[in-house]
Curated annotation (Swiss-Prot):
Molecular-function GO terms, alphabetical: 3'-5'-RNA exonuclease activity; RNA binding
Family from the record: Belongs to the RNase PH family. Rrp41 subfamily.
Disulfide bonds: none
Enzyme Commission no: 3.1.13.-
Gene name linked to the record: rrp41
Matching SUPFAM superfamilies: Ribonuclease PH domain 2-like, Ribosomal protein S5 domain 2-like
Pfam families: RNase_PH, RNase_PH_C
Protein name: Exosome complex component Rrp41
Species whose genome carries this gene: Nitrosopumilus maritimus (strain SCM1)
């Protein structure tokens, strides 16, 4: 990121990106609610070539007890990339990046979850990245929201997430791995559409003030598309495609 020299054509003269998409076209997204019988809630997402499984457990007692909060519940998130999720086998031990993304996702989810409804307890979110292809934090955040809803955790809204970015001096939606590595900017955004609130906003790269505003708008519009797929996943599980 940050304007590194590209080794491939990221955008051709017709405005087509390296994977054939237009500037405002997301990758293929498939979300499924449920699937893990031993979890209180779960979900599976394919976001481009990302494949991520999420399990939610709780609310349940906090151990050790002194870590509990008498006024509110605790949300705990673990983001983990399987050793086979990337081309070169990854060390199975938690990396600094995994710890950082766990914290980012936790903080993006907290405004959505009504933790005050279950004091002295914890909700654990386990995120397993089975295959990675750029944008895993957005895909994981999206899937985690569905899994929390599937678990019946009280929520103000679901958080939908996608990344906007800048490639070949053009603002784009849904940055893939090649664009992330060789593009000019990457902006992951998490958004609660019903409340019109952003819960995640990061920027890697350099943007002008105008590009910054455009990236946010493109990202928010993309989150609204993702949100419809989140709702569909829950509707498909609980209502069998009946209704909206």
């Amino acid at each position: 990121m940050g304007g590194r020299e590209a080794t491939m054509v990221l955008m051709d003269e017709n405005g087509k990106r390296c994977d054939g998409r237009t500037v405002d076209e997301p990758r293929r997204i498939m979300i499924k609610a449920g699937g893990l019988k031993n979890a209180d809630g779960s979900s599976y997402i394919e976001f481009g070539d990302n494949k991520i499984l999420v399990g939610v457990f709780g609310p349940r007692d906090v151990h050790p007890k002194h870590m509990s909060d008498t006024d509110t519940g605790i949300l705990r998130v673990r983001y983990h990339m399987e050793p086979f999720s990337v081309g070169e086998r990854k060390n199975p031990a938690p990396s600094r990046r995994e710890i950082e993304i766990s914290k980012v996702i936790k903080e993006a989810l907290e405004p959505a979850v009504m933790l005050e409804k279950f004091p002295r307890t914890a909700v654990d979110v386990f995120i397993e990245v089975l295959q990675a292809d750029g944008g895993t934090r957005c895909a994981a955040l999206t899937a985690a929201s569905v899994a929390l809803a599937d678990a019946g955790i009280p929520m103000r809204d679901m958080v939908a997430a996608i990344a906007a970015g800048k490639v070949a001096d053009t603002v784009i939606l849904d940055v893939n791995n090649e664009e992330d590595q060789a593009g000019q900017a990457d902006m992951p955004i998490g958004y609660m559409p019903n409340l019109e609130k952003i819960t995640l906003l990061q920027l890697d790269g350099v943007l002008t003030p105008e590009e910054y505003k455009k990236c946010i708008q493109v990202g928010v519009d993309g989150c609204k598309l993702v949100y419809e797929l989140q709702k569909k996943a829950l509707n498909d599980k609980y209502f069998g495609n009946k209704g909206d």
